Amino acid sequence: MATAEPETSTNPSNSEEKNEENEQQIVSLEDYIKHPLQNRWALWFFKNDKSKTWQANLRLISKFDTVEDFWALYNHIQLSSNLMSGCDYSLFKDGIEPMWEDERNKRGGRWLITLSKQQRRADLDRFWLETLLCLVGEAFDDHSDDVCGAVVNIRTKGDKIAIWTTDYENKDAIVHIGRVYKERLGVPPKVIIGYQSHADTATKSGSTTKNKFVV
């Protein structure tokens, strides 16, 4: 007499539920993992109070070294276009202060973008954010080590944005940085941007400072 063997079957719904649980655990874990940046950065704010010294007007806002903390900070502060005239934002690598006298800056210079009054509404915030992304994303390949930081100056006559580099004689690095920066901002090819050394800028007014390099 034949005996019926007990059926062994797997419940497909159970295995699917376990897979979903595993996927949820992975997603939840990724939510807590921050993405580190190559460098630690410091954001500074300058407010031009003539009753105080220049150094007293410069204030460190915060430091960050992850993608998530960058966006948290950026979304928390005022846009550049909303700042009062005479104010600056500066983003520099940790350990470098946003002043010409700093050891990493004193033999350096800057790629300078000058904006018209009309460009404050149209381009300023977009240009500044793209500048920040170039810095924290190390957009300049092997020459990103030459980058010290960037500054946006809010001024009545016209705003300025600049990327500072550490050595005004390092032509290869400077030109590469300038070309990448110009492309990232979407500046038309016919528009020329210039690079000036801090030493020249310190001894001359901005309108007469000679460009060492142009792209």
UniProtKB/Swiss-Prot annotation:
Interacts with eif4ebp3l. PANTHER family: EUKARYOTIC TRANSLATION INITIATION FACTOR 4E RELATED, EUKARYOTIC TRANSLATION INITIATION FACTOR 4E-RELATED. One of its GO terms (cellular component) is nuclear speck. Belongs to the eukaryotic initiation factor 4E family. Pfam families: IF4E. It comes from Danio rerio (Zebrafish). This is Eukaryotic translation initiation factor 4E-1A. GO terms for molecular function: RNA 7-methylguanosine cap binding; translation initiation factor activity.
